[in-house]
Amino acid sequence: MLRCPLFGLLLLLCTAAALPAAQPCFPGAVGYGIETPGGRGGKVLTVTTLAGSGPGSLREALAAKGPRIVVFAVGGVIDLAEQALEIDEPFVTVAGQTAPAPGITLIRAGLRISAHDVVLRHLRVRPGDCGKPKKSGWSPDGLSTYTAQTPGAQGPHDIVIDHCSFTWAVDENLSASGVRHAGRAFTSHRVTFSNNIIAEGLAQSTHEKGEHSKGTLIHDNAREIAILGNLYACNTERNPVLKPDAAAVIANNLVYNPAKRAIHTYWNTREYEGKMQTMLPATLVIVGNTLWTGPNTPPEMPFVFIQNGKADVYLQDNLTLGPGGKPVAEVGGNPKILKECPFWPAGYTALPAKEAAEHVLNQAGARPWDRDAIDERIVAGVRARTGKMIDSQEQVGGYPKPEPTRHTLTVPADPQALDAWLESFIPKS
């Protein structure tokens, strides 16, 4: 029996088989794909420059072949100059916690992952509008997993994005994507987004469509997706959104001030023209989450909205709080409500929603022990219920400009000691 652990109790609500997890990619990892080794057992590559490319750069380390662990001898801002970082070589761990304060922030572009077996931790990604005119067509994601456009390429899989901060994207802040009509193997699968800040998607900005503040898109057919313990703040919608046949566990997240939709599903007839008979419903397991409405939230908005009833939804212990702490509707759109949990990540125990929100505010984002001014401001705005939608990073202080820092890393000679060494950079609370 697959067990759906909640509040420390083992609730026998599911029926699919589950095996005990292998060694996780880092201590405490939960979700799907966490058995990936990432770069474990490979070479250690040290980032020694904040340049956007060239020798010693993060771009060079990500492009290297073979298993690799990327660590940082420098801290500060990496200006990507409108050229996204590509991770198309598998088996990599990016350990942002190894950077000296203030850590690593990527600006003026984001990350794209088409590889498998990727672990990314403790980075900030803040693409922004690059000073371009509104509706000019600049539409970067913060981070997106996607399927490479090569013959037979399968979708990215076994990917863990943990304790990162994603803000100011013009398309989605953080997404799992792929090919729409090629089947499940050709889109993202076994992907976990955990303990991230996903906030302030730019609204009336440079996207050609105009308003486009989006949190997370889970693409058609993406399966075994875990969205756990994240802070979604001040994104118009997609907090997250699932497309047809996508399947995700959405647990212990705090969603603040969605301006149109919080959790929802979406599809349009143009994308499925001639293929409606093949369209399968999305499946959402929504447990222990909290909605806090804000200045931009419409009063009639439900926490979960299902377009045209095309979804199966399991709901448990979600808090939906409007002005003055009054509850708002949990679900709208007439989905099929499941009485039993259809799937659940092995070994994961959700917190009660009444505890999860505070946990998220304390622990989410890159380097929660060493938050930058942007993350501090976002979290403070959530706590005070004053955070609002923005159209440009210039409304909230602009791109960060910390002084570059440097330190010396002493990488253990014993490969067996590397995991403990990487964790030693994270203060234990």
Regions found by a protein language model. Give the residues of each.
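Acidic Gly/Asp/Thr-rich repetitive segments characteristic of extracellular carbohydrate-active
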Residues: 26-70
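Residues in short coils/turns that link rungs of repeat/solenoid architectures in beta-rich domains
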Residues: 127, 168, 200, 233-234, ...
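Bacterial N-terminal signal peptides
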Residues: 5-16
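Extracellular beta-rich repeat passengers
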Residues: 242-397, 403, 411
